[in-house]
Amino acid sequence: MTEVHVIVPEGIDDPARPSGGNTYDRRVCRGLAALGWAVHEQVVPGAWPRAGEAGHAALARAVRRIPDGAVVLLDGLIASTAPEALVPQARRLRQVVLVHMPLGHRPPDDEAGAVRARERDVLAAATAVVTTSAWTRRRLGELYALPADRVNVAEPGVDTAGLAPGTTAGDALLCVGAVTPAKGHDVLLAALTTVADLSWRCACVGSLDRAPAFADRVRRRAWKDELRDRVGFSGPRTGPELDRAYAAADLLVLASHAETYGMVVTEALARGLPVLATDVGGVTEALGCGKDGTRPGARCCASRR
């Protein structure tokens, strides 16, 4: 039986903090097990990628316990920050790093050099790298000159779903994602302000505790006159609750500054929901193209001039 040791962050199954990366990791583990692999999962404590000494020590212990020659699949949130634990073990283990978002893509200016150096060392020592989009593979090449043949793309799948009935008025907007600077909720509210004369309401579904100061600012902005009572923040939703949120929507809106893929995009499309999203990262791969090779609705930005 083929074996794989999978190292994932603490909280991977926490319903209060859902994420596309956690969902992807969990589905990979289940998929490998369904194919007959023996999956040995190791959850590492800490607030990765900013885990403290205890988290890094736990990772080092976990890696040292893995037998020689084993395949080790590591979530990039962990791996990309831990060259001290991983690089010395690279000759002994077949390390495969799953990069959801390169930490070196948009790090804080005062940390950029150190963040990129650590990620570069880990990826250079890895046996292979897996990304969730072709955009991410290209970005790793730009950042670290990784040969394309060492970086494998495994796009997320999407479950089939019934068509979302939506609303009679057709004015229900839905934004799914943690309220963080990267997801651009401030940009979304600014855009909604420009169409305040139209009929719409927007439900924002996602964790509010990832960047609490930012989330508080966004929510205060949503309470101002032109947006009051039109934008709601419900916190995270998973399973049937998230299904109901999709079913009640007429349009998915996504204002992210960076996305390696955008699993919520394919979740919406699977339900027949149209999507209006920023043209960043791998979002265009998630959206796909029409038969003529163009993205449906690409000219919608010109519709209100």
Regions found by a protein language model. Name each.
Residues 236-237, 244-249:
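Short alpha-helical donor nucleotide-sugar binding micro-motif in glycosyltransferases
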Residues 135, 157:
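Carbohydrate-associated surface elements
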Residues 166-183, 189-194, 203:
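Conserved donor-binding/catalytic core segment of Leloir-type glycosyltransferases
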Residues 257:
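Aromatic "clamp/platform" in nucleotide-sugar-dependent glycosyltransferases that forms part
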Residues 201-219, 235-236:
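Glycosyltransferase donor-sugar binding loop
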Residues 59-86, 96:
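Short N-terminal targeting/anchoring amphipathic segment
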Residues 274-277, 284:
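Short hydrophobic beta-strand element within catalytic cores of glycosyltransferases
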